[in-house]
């Protein structure tokens, strides 16, 4: 069984599959569809974070699922989805083979569609935008974090899973999809998007000068895909050669992605120290450490907002708790659960919540987020205004760094 770590507006960790437990009946007596249902049940039984399985008898759930007529893959998929729905966890979900392949492409650095990172609100159940991908049709149309997607092509999203919603927004380049959007304090409105190829180069970098003429390296990281760590390391190296004396790392509207990518990026800024703790259902802790030489020890400010989620929060929390960076902006999204992706025997996939994470100071940020050292709220700005005088959070970060550079210069 193959395993793979991935992101989806959400944060995932490598996990290995061990023993499986017993069948409800001898393996030879099971159809392929029943074997698939049992395969999913065993993975959840072994790995799921909540050992009460949402306060239900998980063995009974298996028995009920296998008693249903499962005459084709679609029937098996339906039984699996119903079984997982009983956990009341939007992050533990089944992906049919097409959805699984699409998710693998998403984390590889290539994507086509409207460019939305989405999540189900665990309290309201509504389908929400985590963030639009930079330069995507969704961003160009003005979609924002926390926007509610009420309908897709006229169909209510009320009972859709994440993957069903994502599938309805996918389609050929140049095709149209209509969304009904709800935004707090505003009337519902329809937005028409034209699907396109989404560029997933995760790093934007350039050297800037503070009002006092101090060279500041500006880095914007848009997501943690397979290319993120390598691209960021290259950008830091280039800025160091150009004489950067301090850095701004912009994680605003970064929905996360691959956990390992977040850890690798944290190691680029830390010589030592804990990056993150993971806690499984037995309460056992694992941890990831920085062990090596940081790419730079220059002063660092991280920009965050409510669209900063998952792996972005791991990075921000690690550098804040280790005293390596100051955070400026708004409280982050609050996604502190870890999923692992399992490839199933028929080519479909299963994402399972297997653990939660804590920052180095043992903060559990799930549904709470990370509070910045300096809170600066601001109205949404255009992509062209990011990092300009119109960007109050960026200007506040420059001010913090300028003071740090003055202190360093007077020692």
Predicted regions and their residues:
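Cleft-lining beta-strand/loop regions that shape enzyme active-site pockets
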Residues: 139, 153-156, 163-335, 339-340
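Sec-exported extracytoplasmic/periplasmic mature domains
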Residues: 41-49, 63-70, 79-92, 151-154, ...
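Terminal targeting/pro-maturation regions of precursor/exported proteins
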Residues: 2-93
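PDZ/PDZ-like domain segments forming the peptide/carboxylate-binding groove
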Residues: 109-151, 155-158, 226, 355
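Extended, small/polar residue-biased N-terminal targeting/export presequences
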Residues: 52-126, 176-177, 183-205, 406-409
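Terminal peptide-recognition signature
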Residues: 40, 79, 83, 116, ...
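Conserved functional hotspot residues or short segments at active or partner-binding sites
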Residues: 365, 384-388, 392-411
């Amino acid at each position: 069984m193959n395993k793979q770590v991935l992101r989806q507006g959400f944060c995932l960790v490598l996990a290995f599959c061990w023993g499986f437990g017993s069948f409800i009946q001898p393996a030879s007596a099971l159809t392929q569809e029943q074997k698939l249902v049992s395969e999913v049940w065993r993975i959840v039984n072994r790995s799921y974070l909540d050992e009460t399985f949402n306060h239900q008898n998980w063995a009974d759930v298996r028995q009920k699922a296998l008693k249903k007529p499962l005459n084709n893959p679609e029937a098996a998929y339906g039984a699996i989805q119903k079984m997982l729905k009983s956990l009341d966890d939007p992050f533990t979900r089944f992906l049919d083979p097409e959805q699984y392949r699409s998710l693998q492409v998403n984390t590889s650095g290539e994507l086509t569609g409207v460019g939305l990172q989405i999540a189900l609100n665990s309290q309201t159940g509504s389908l929400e935008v985590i963030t639009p991908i930079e330069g995507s049709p969704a961003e160009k149309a003005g979609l924002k974090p926390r926007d509610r997607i009420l309908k897709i092509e006229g169909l209510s999203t009320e009972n859709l899973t994440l993957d069903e919603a994502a599938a309805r927004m996918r389609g050929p380049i140049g095709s149209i999809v209509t969304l009904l959007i709800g935004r707090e304090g505003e009337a519902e409105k329809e937005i028409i998007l034209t699907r396109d190829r989404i560029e997933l180069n995760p790093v934007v970098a350039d050297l800037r000068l503070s009002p006092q003429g101090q060279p500041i390296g500006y880095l914007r990281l848009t997501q943690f895909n397979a290319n993120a760590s390598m691209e960021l390391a290259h950008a830091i190296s280039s800025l160091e050669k150009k004489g950067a004396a301090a850095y701004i790392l912009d994680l605003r509207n970064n929905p996360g992605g691959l956990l390992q990518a977040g850890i690798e990026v944290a190691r680029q800024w830390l010589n030592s120290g804990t990056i993150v703790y993971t806690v499984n259902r037995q309460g056992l802790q694992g941890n990831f450490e920085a062990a090596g030489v940081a790419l730079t020890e220059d002063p660092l400010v991280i920009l965050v907002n409510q669209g900063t989620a998952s792996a972005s929060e791991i990075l921000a929390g690690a550098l804040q708790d280790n005293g390596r960076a100051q955070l400026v902006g708004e409280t982050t999204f609050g996604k502190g659960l870890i999923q692992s992706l399992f490839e199933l025997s028929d080519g479909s996939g299963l994402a399972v919540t297997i653990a939660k994470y804590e920052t180095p100071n043992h903060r559990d940020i799930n549904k709470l987020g990370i509070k910045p050292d300096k809170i600066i709220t601001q109205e949404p700005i255009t992509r062209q205004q990011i990092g300009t005088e119109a960007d109050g959070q960026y200007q506040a970060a420059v001010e913090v760094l300028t003071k740090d550079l003055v202190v360093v210069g007077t020692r």
